[in-house]
Amino acid sequence: KKNIWGDWIGKIGKLEMFFALCPILQGFNLGGFPLSLIVWILMLLVIFVRGYKIRLDTYKPLLMLAIYWLLHTIVVALQDNVNTNAMIAQVIYFLAIFSVYPLLNIEKLRRALNIVCIIVMAGLLYQWMEIMITGETHPLEIIGLQMSKERLETLSVRPSSFFMEPAAYAEFMLLPIALALMDKRIIWAIILILSVFFTSSTTGIVTCFLMLGAWTFMQKKRKALIVIPLIAIGLIYALNHFSVFEVGVDKLNNTDVETNVRLTQGEYVVGTMEGAEYIFGVPYSSAYNYCKSGRATNVIYYGEAVYMPTFWNLILLYGLVGLFLYLMTLFNLLKICKQLFPLITSLIITMYSGGMGLTSSFVYCMIFMLVVGTDYSKNQICSKKHLK
């Protein structure tokens, strides 16, 4: 007999589905081990078992960033205590990018992402109904897994589905929204954007409008230049006239740029660096170690961590050289596929408020952009230049 379910899963792609689920899974632990690392180890094991080779010469800007990180870490290890586990994890992250992206099929990935989007939006709807009934909601959990860190609020009036916080949900949705815009599936993109508005994530709301603006800027057809601004106006109207979005709008209006820790703490810490350190970074392995040494005393600690946005954290730990290589890794993707402009623009802007850095979220985004960019390049939808 024909295995119908097997054929259906095959059309999606098991590897692609697992990859699409990574942003959800990496927020949990399995038996005390963080899935943010385990998911990439599992994918590497699958690749090695299948006999695929790692293509280190595939995307040179990323390879240069990886080499700089390794040399920099070795030098810092001679002067400060380096977390060995974190160092091994970072090596695995870089290996995962080089190994995974050549194996993913864009069509199967698109289907897998759409299915995961439907699942997380269903979770969002469930939480929203719970808020309507009880006035608050619990974070959704996955049976057999534990949350990797305690949430600041066990109960919340802001839904986030299976993610740790609304900002994490918004970060995940950036990629499907970008893909929907690239495919000109405007209705699907609007649905995804509205789901981000449901979370009341300030970063998510701002980023969605940035992506729409960047995508409109790229359009040459007069119809698109008229339709997209109308959609943006409609979204703004929805934000201001529907009570379901009230929390997000209030949060956006009440955000004090001058006092918000997420926006100001990084600038303060970097301001305590000495002249020569701006080139290659400070001789400390983390912002926490740097601040605890007495170099920056007026900071707020989150356990054994100091929150700093990606932009400032890169300057602190890796200097302007590291920041330059990081940005070139993103900018050079535009040579492969100009249609990635809205997504890359959003990622660069959120560097001032988000903490993606070189984490597992960076791995996920890079793999996605390389898969999409390479496919569009091959089909001559984007630039005809291939990876060098």
What is the predicted function of each stretch?
Residues P61-L70, D80-L103:
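Aromatic-anchored transmembrane helix interface
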Residues N3, L212-F217, R222-V227, L314-T350:
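Hydrophobic transmembrane alpha-helices and their immediate junctions
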